[in-house]
Design a protein with these regions (language model features):
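M16/MPP (pitrilysin/insulinase) zinc-metallopeptidase core fold and M16-derived inactive scaffolds
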Residues: 21, 26-90, 264-280
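A conserved active-site cap/scaffold subdomain adjacent to cofactor or substrate pockets
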Residues: 247, 253-266, 270
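N- or domain-start disorder-to-order transition segments that initiate the globular core
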Residues: 1-24
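Charge-rich, well-structured scaffold segments of protease-associated domains
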Residues: 7, 15-18, 62-217, 228, ...
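A generic structural signal for residues located within well-ordered alpha-helices
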Residues: 40-44, 98, 119, 250-253, ...
């Protein structure tokens, strides 16, 4: 594998990783802007842009976009997160130029016709309704709200239904003009790709995109709190979040290992103690989410109403115990899981393109796989205990 990056004159970064023995290419544009860059007034616009990107440009209708990609057997998709937005395609290697052309078209010449806007507003409102009927979605949205109350990072990615219903096309144009600038976009491809050819495509299709200043985001502070909601359900859905670490913290990798020890699989402490030993739940897991300046460490479980009083103390006790008695065999097992996951992801060009893009947006560079493995291997028992202590005593928790 050969990984390369070139920065165009306007600031747009072009990244590629050429892989031997493959016939396909995954290519996408990642934008350093997501839901946390919204205001209360335009909450939901980043997600609406993701929906509207495929609904027509100056030269292509929504049907044209779908037909062109699917006529060559390609797959087109997008997603919105709190910090980033991505638009990506997977195609046969000979169709890379078509993919870049379509990506450039939808990101620079989308028309956001009112008829399409009206239909897509209705679709997103249905998506919001479906989310509100899905306990897993509700619990994590409410947890985010109480973790970061009255802050952009705490607001829903989908936005409120009433805000979406009133959102006009000018809101989308304004958000794109402010945030979709060359210095905040990167074009990334992995698979059967020639870097020089990709750079030439980027120059031709994105070279006139204006550089633009980097828009500062509202710094977030984890504050904690509680959200309770009664519904007619079979289970109590419980989630606990604690202040955690940003991407650039020295304990970022120890936190990933610690999370795996605590709730990262069937051998994890939470799974063994809560499910296997006590039978208190079917689903229990934890994960660490890092942002640019902060983070959240989350534990989730679903249980019966009669069991929640026993479940919560057990979860809290397991979290607290980890800072004092994390064992070397647990650390070894967690490191092996993380290393295996890292190496297995290399087998997918789409996963690899995603990794390279995210690393560049977050760290400003592509991290060699060998370095990732070294950093995981460097995490020892003392580091896991230390980071468990940092997180468990880091501040007021959030509960939903």
């Amino acid at each position: 594998m050969t990984t390369q990056m070139t920065t165009l004159a306007n600031g747009l970064r072009v990244i590629s990783e050429s892989r031997d023995g493959v016939q396909t290419t995954a290519v996408g544009v990642w934008v350093d802007a997501g839901a946390r860059y919204e205001s209360i007034a335009n909450n939901g616009v980043a997600h609406m842009l993701e929906h509207m990107a495929f609904k027509g440009t100056d030269s292509r209708s929504a049907r044209d976009i779908a037909v062109e990609i699917e006529s060559v057997g390609g797959h087109l998709n997008a997603y919105t997160s709190r910090e980033h937005t991505a638009y990506f395609v997977r195609v046969l290697k000979e169709d890379l130029a078509l993919s870049v052309d379509i990506l450039a078209d939808i990101l620079q010449r989308s028309t956001f016709e009112e008829a399409e806007m009206a239909r897509e507003r209705a679709v997103v409102i249905q998506e919001i309704g479906q989310s509100e009927d899905t306990p897993d979605d509700i619990i994590f949205d409410r947890l985010q709200e109480v973790s970061f109350p009255n802050q952009a990072l705490g607001r829903s990615i989908l936005g409120p239904a009433e805000g979406v219903a009133a959102m006009g096309r000018e809101v989308l144009f304004d958000f794109m003009a402010e945030h979709y600038t060359a210095s905040r976009l990167l074009l990334c491809a992995a698979g059967a790709v020639d870097h020089d050819a990709l750079v030439a495509m980027a120059e031709a299709k994105f070279g006139n995109l204006r550089p633009g200043a980097h828009h500062p985001f509202e710094a977030a502070v984890f504050k904690g709190g509680e959200s309770r909601e009664e519904r007619e359900l079979e289970q109590v859905h419980f989630a606990l979040a604690l202040p955690a670490l940003p991407y650039d913290d020295d304990d970022f990798y120890p936190m990933q290992v610690m999370s795996t020890v605590l709730g990262g699989g069937m051998s994890s402490r939470l799974f063994q103690e809560v499910r296997e030993k006590r039978g208190l739940c079917y689903s229990i897991f934890c994960f660490a989410t890092s942002y640019k300046e902060c983070g959240a460490f989350t534990i989730y479980a679903g249980t019966g109403a009669d069991q929640v009083g026993e479940l919560v103390p057990v979860i809290c006790n397991e979290m607290l115990r980890l800072s004092g008695d994390a064992a070397q065999d647990e650390v070894n097992r967690a490191r092996a899981q993380l290393k295996a996951g890292t190496l297995m992801s290399l087998e997918s060009s789409a996963s690899r393109a995603e990794q390279l893009a995210r690393q560049t947006l977050v760290f400003g560079r592509q991290i060699p796989v060998e370095e990732l493995i070294e950093r995981i291997d460097a995490v020892d028992m003392a580091a896991v205990r230390r980071v468990a202590g940092r997180i468990s005593s880091g501040g007021e928790p959030a509960v939903a």
